[in-house]
Curated annotation (Swiss-Prot):
Disulfide bonds: none annotated. May have GTPase activity. May also bind and hydrolyze ATP. May function as chaperone. Likely to have a role in propionyl-CoA and adenosylcobalamin metabolism. NCBIfam families: lao, PRK09435.1. This is Methylmalonic aciduria type A homolog, mitochondrial. The gene is mmaa-1. Its EC number is 3.6.-.-. Residues 1-15 form a transit peptide. The lineage of its organism: Eukaryota, Metazoa, Ecdysozoa, Nematoda, Chromadorea. SUPFAM superfamilies: P-loop containing nucleoside triphosphate hydrolases (SSF52540). The keyword Lyase does not apply. InterPro entries: GTPase_ArgK, P-loop_NTPase. Belongs to the SIMIBI class G3E GTPase family. ArgK/MeaB subfamily.
Length: 399
């Protein structure tokens, strides 16, 4: 009897163990798609903390001597310090990037105090200028800069964005040769930056450069883009005003400009209003005035203007300049300026998140090890790009 009971207990225990084993084996495991030639193990999990120390530097503090020295020189209006500061915030080096972020925080704190004392008078006017190649952007900016510095007593900063070649990685950066007079003006500062393929054509540090120009005491910053496209959308997210330049020499100019570019523009200027093109410029102006009637203005307090200008006629440049500041006063009094600045800061936070995540993702040991193999699988047609992307993302998160 005792033996029979022991045998029954033994059988029950054995069955329980089998059920427990099945329960354990049925526990869901992390899903990793089956990809030929890719090792499914994750040997780099322990490197995440070390990798974060390579990518970010937390040792930079408010008392960093390099940051303090650069901050004092920048606040005194040094153009050399401004150039060094912009280079610092554009750097990808962890320590330099940390120093750049600390410098930006100090500048923003200082500008906040100035705003409490002087209000809108302490703020820099941000103007984006766009237009198709050959419209005369550089010549117009030089004429506008001369009007602002010589006749209106303003300090002008010009930030130009040149496209980076997708084939060679180089860029022309030729605006300094086209703005020779303005580059020699002591009240002007010109900085050229390649897009480096980031943010739809807007270089990574351009927004920070605007903040640094404000800290250096400049009254107006002009951001010039090359061509019309995605970069104009990004530039409009960091400017107070968008100015679109149009050329009467390009035939049917109205067909060559995207509706979205016109809708985000606050001022349209037909250039080269002189000589044989004067009649054509007047006709182009009339066409755009008519076209704008069918578009809703970006702001309720401002209806976009269409003007004509020629760098040969200083009075026409002065009229454009007056329209710029008419817009500035209008949005300042209505409260749209402060609201727009706040929205821009939020958008640029998410732009930086996207840019930073992509950089971290591509350089992470897991992905650096996995990506070349997945690329080979895509080339051989054994896996779709979508599945390869999912594999990398799930490998990165370990799920």
């Amino acid at each position: 009897m005792v033996v029979r009971s022991l045998l029954r207990v033994s059988r029950l225990t054995s069955a329980s163990c089998r059920h427990a084993s099945l329960a354990v084996s049925s526990t869901p495991k992390p899903y990793i798609p089956s990809v030929t030639g890719v090792q499914k193990s994750m040997p780099f999990d322990n490197l995440l903390e070390q990798y974060s120390r390579v990518h970010w530097d937390d040792s930079v503090t408010y008392d960093d001597p390099n940051v303090q020295k650069l901050f004092k020189s920048l606040m005194s209006g040094s153009r050399a310090a401004l150039a060094s500061a912009i280079t610092l915030v554009e750097s990808r080096h962890p320590t330099k990037r940390a120093q750049g972020n600390m410098l930006l925080k100090m500048v923003l704190d200082e500008e906040r105090e100035k705003y409490k004392k002087f209000g809108r008078d302490s703020m820099i006017f941000r103007v984006g200028i766009s237009g198709s190649p050959g419209v005369g952007k550089s010549s117009f900016i030089e004429a506008l800069g001369a009007e602002l510095t010589e006749n209106r007593g303003k300090k002008v900063a010009v930030l130009t964005i040149d496209p980076t070649s997708a084939m060679t990685g180089g860029s022309v950066l030729g605006d300094l040769t086209r703005m020779q007079e303005l580059s020699r003006n002591p009240k002007a500062y010109i900085r050229q930056s390649p897009t480096s393929g980031s943010l739809g054509g807007v270089t990574r540090g351009i927004h920070e450069a605007v903040i640094l120009c404000e800290g250096a005491g400049y009254d107006i910053v002009i951001i010039e883009t090359v061509g019309v496209g995605q970069s104009e959308t990004s530039v409009s997210d960091m400017c107070d005003m968008m100015c679109l330049l149009l050329s009467p020499a390009h035939g049917d100019e109205l067909q060559g400009v995207k509706r979205g570019i016109m809708e985000m523009s606050d001022l349209l200027v037909v250039t080269k209003d002189d000589g044989d093109l004067k009649a054509k410029a007047k006709m182009t102006q009339a066409e755009y005035i008519s076209a704008l009637k069918f578009m809703r203005p970006r702001l309720d307090v401002w209806r976009p203007k269409v003007m004509r200008s020629s760098i040969m006629d200083k009075e026409s440049v002065s009229e454009v300049c007056s329209s710029l500041y008419e817009f500035w006063d209008t949005i300042g009094e209505s409260g749209d300026l402060e609201r727009r600045r706040q929205d821009q800061m939020k958008k640029w936070m998410w732009n930086h998140v996207k840019d930073e995540i992509m950089s971290v993702f591509q350089k992470h040991p897991k992905i650096a090890h996995l990506a070349p193999k997945l690329e080979n699988e895509i080339r051989s047609g054994k896996i779709t790009p979508g599945l390869a992307a999912e594999t990398m993302i799930r490998t990165f998160f370990g799920v």
